Amino acid sequence: FFAETFKTLFRNLSENSVMQKLLLYEMTTINSTTKRSAETRDVMNLNLITFYENLFAPAKINIKSIASILIGGIYYLILHKECAKICTIDYKTKEGENAFSEGIDFLTDIIFDRLEMYDRDKKAIRQMISDGISESKICKYMGINKNDLKTLLSE
């Protein structure tokens, strides 16, 4: 669902010239109307962002930052695609859209792999504790410090 959200934004914005013009207008004209329009768009996504923020917070993944970078990148790719290729990719074409989708899938895999790794490490640490392995050895084996260990054990 995470990756599909960004793919849908890319497709919908690609096909919506009115929204593209609105984004350009918001970037070039700062007034109460453009601010309200941009802020409303941000608020509309608040529930989704909060869901992901809660999901990724234990693994210390700043998903709001990642999402904002991806959204900003999508805006740029769409608004710039008529001007020139970006990194030799022509985002006006089906191949360009496929390249975008592959990139989003790759980044999503990395983000979710980190979350899974965090959960796996937490389980391994708890198992080591129950097996009687000392905290200092756990820190050594896991490559973490005592504060990180305490954080993992407190969650």
Where are these regions (language model features)?
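Amphipathic alpha-helical packing segments from all-alpha helical-bundle domains
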Residues: E4, R11, E15, L22-L24, ...
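Hydrophobic/aromatic-rich alpha-helical bundle segments in the mid-to-C-terminal region
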Residues: D42, Y52-L107, I111, L115
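Short, amphipathic alpha-helical "recognition" segments used to contact nucleic acids or chromatin
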Residues: M117-I133
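Intrinsically disordered, low-complexity regulatory regions
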Residues: K123, S154-E155
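DNA major-groove recognition helix of helix-turn-helix
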Residues: I129, M142, L153-S154
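The alpha-helix within a helix-turn-helix
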Residues: C139
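Key DNA-contact positions within bacterial/archaeal DNA-binding proteins
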Residues: N147
